[in-house]
Amino acid sequence: MAYSTFAAIDIGSSCMEMVIYEISRDYGIKEIDHIRHIFELGKSTYEKREVDFEDVEKMCDILYGFSEIMKDYCIDDYRAFATSALREARNAVRVLDRIKVRTGIDVEILSNSEQRFIIYKALAARSDKFNKIIEKSTALVDVGAGSTQVSLFNNGTLVTTQNVKLGAVRISNMMSALSQNVANYVDIMREYIDNDMVTLNELFLRSKKISNVIFVGDCVPYYVRMKDYFDDGEYITRDRFKAFLDKIYHKSIEQIADIMMLQENQAKLILPSAMVYTRMLDFTQADAIWMPQVTLCDGMAVEHAQKTKKFELKHDFNADILATAKNISQRYSIR
């Protein structure tokens, strides 16, 4: 059996991770190792639009460690992607140069569209579930660190996709000062989220009857730990999801960490992401929610497997492009 080893590196806003995969025609894509470092890069870049020198050096230390692990595994190929935290940094080019000099790793900065498309490919790789769900009107809600992407599907194709600057890390950073000084900061957080979400609903969702909802994002693996709320590991009802939100709604970060068995820097992202997801539920008629644990690294592995002719996606992405273009032309009365 011919197989190759591939390393996917994700420099995110709240953590850095590397996943090692074995890829073959016979057995597809298999994860064999996963290394994760909590590193809040977005905390500085979302506020100051620059990566501090100390953060650059810490990032290089972590990436150098990744490079040594890749040598141990005799990796055939790798990709290293950075997302919104570096995308929004004014000194991003200097940071990438420093990383290359210190670690030998070439890091590429993804645009928002590229990032979401790669995650979308990871979903499409789970074709049996994904293709069945999107036959009916479906909202895919991807809550990232810096923003949220809402994509609508119908009859198996993508209809439209919209982005709002409501990410879990961004919201958490903006609310952190208030949490110490204001008693009702959770209500203020909800108002802040509503400012963009209500507009999104009015412009793009209100006329749509959405039957299914797919939630993806950095915090999804934390949610599915709450096994009492889920059916078959990845499915949860509207009522159970809202019951979960009620359980954590007025809890402190320390209490959420205890309830969900998380570190505090992970727990502080739960309430912001849950409130965005819940607001989307309010705009739909969906009762069942699918929360697959797909990541950017998974999508990177899918892309590599496609490139090396070891994996083929069944979903028709060209049909998505045509359907989306048609939708835009109709919206602006273009013939």
PLM regions and their residue ranges:
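Gly/Thr-rich phosphate-binding beta-strand-loop-beta motif of the actin/hexokinase/Hsp70
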Residues: 2-30, 132-161, 218
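Short acidic/polar alpha-helix capping motifs at helix-coil junctions
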Residues: 8-10, 29-34, 61, 241-245
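Hydrophobic residues in beta-strands and at strand termini
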Residues: 11, 39-41, 143, 166
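Helical "lid/coupling" subdomains associated with nucleotide-phosphate turnover
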Residues: 20, 44-72, 85-93, 101-135, ...
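Conserved ATP-binding subdomain of kinase catalytic cores across diverse folds
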Residues: 26-40, 45, 71
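Acidic donor-binding segment of Leloir-type glycosyltransferases
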Residues: 98
